């Protein structure tokens, strides 16, 4: 039976591998994983620019992932499995190559971080061709929800635009509101991914969305990043099943 699974595919590499094996035995795509940024219109435009080659090869990427608050019980590992997992998948998709090593670094803690939680954290990841990716991850940013990305290429850069909000000028001030959460930032992405999944099941859309192998790869990369939270060093990704 076809299944749409919210990310992550599973919480352990072994469970992800078992899902991949079951799907392979069935001989067809059964699982789509909810990596919805692949369906966001802005990300798709960036993907098209990269694929065109007009800016040359990508060299580096700088990202921010800021959430104003998080529920009790949030752990350091969840910074990777619940937050960074999106950047892990989006760059596998955008660059068309694997992330092969990474490191997590802790900064000075915000006063809003719960006991035992390092926040913010900085993720460094390298692809097979040595594209360097840095991601600032914060789940206690206080001021609002913000996702940012700039990709540095040989002939120029590509920056993810901020959500369009009315700019108000009044009483000696000018400014705009900042959104509060992911649901306000990615409504089209969620609609598009579910419609794509339905269309694929009905035979209207020939190309499958992110599947069990993508979920497995993301889990392998996440494991390396979580290991780095403890070791403090660069960790290689192990893709062995």
Residue ranges and their predicted role:
Residues 70-132, 138-143, 213:
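Rossmann-like dinucleotide-binding domain that binds NAD(P)(H)
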Residues 16, 43, 87-91, 191-197, ...:
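A general structural signal for well-ordered alpha-helical segments in protein cores
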Residues 41-63:
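Rossmann-like NAD(P)H-binding beta-loop-alpha module
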Residues 32-35, 61-64, 104, 237:
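Short glycine/serine/threonine-enriched helix-capping/active-site loop
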Residues 4, 30-32, 62, 134, ...:
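Structural detector of well-ordered beta-strand residues that form the stable sheet scaffold
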Residues 113-116, 128-195:
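NAD(P)-dinucleotide binding in Rossmann-like oxidoreductases
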Residues 1-38, 53:
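Beta-strand-loop-alpha-helix segment that lines the small-molecule cofactor/substrate pocket
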Residues 17, 24, 199-241:
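C-terminal helix-rich "cap/oligomerization" subdomain common to oxidoreductases
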């Amino acid at each position: 039976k076809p299944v749409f699974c919210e990310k992550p595919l599973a919480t352990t590499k072994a469970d992800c591998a078992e899902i991949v094996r079951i799907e392979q035995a069935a001989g067809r795509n059964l699982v789509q994983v909810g990596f919805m940024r692949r369906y966001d219109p802005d990300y798709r435009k960036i993907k098209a620019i990269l694929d065109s080659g007009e800016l040359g090869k990508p060299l580096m990427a700088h990202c921010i992932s800021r959430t104003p608050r998080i529920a009790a019980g949030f752990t350091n590992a969840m910074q990777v499995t619940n937050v960074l997992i999106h950047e892990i998948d989006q760059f596998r998709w955008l660059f068309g190559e694997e992330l092969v090593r990474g490191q997590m670094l802790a900064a000075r803690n915000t006063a809003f971080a719960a006991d035992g939680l390092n926040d913010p954290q900085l993720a460094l990841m390298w692809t097979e061709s040595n594209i360097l990716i840095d991601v600032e991850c914060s789940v206690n940013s206080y001021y609002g929800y913000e996702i940012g990305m700039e990709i540095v290429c040989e002939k120029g850069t590509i920056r993810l635009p901020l959500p369009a909000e009315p700019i108000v000028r009044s009483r000696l001030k000018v400014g705009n509101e900042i959104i509060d959460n992911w649901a306000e930032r990615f409504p089209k992405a969620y609609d598009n991914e579910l419609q794509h999944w339905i269309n694929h099941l009905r035979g209207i859309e020939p190309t499958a969305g992110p599947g069990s192998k993508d979920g497995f790869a993301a889990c392998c990369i996440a494991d390396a990043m979580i290991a780095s939270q403890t070791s403090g060093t660069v960790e290689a990704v192990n893709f062995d099943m």
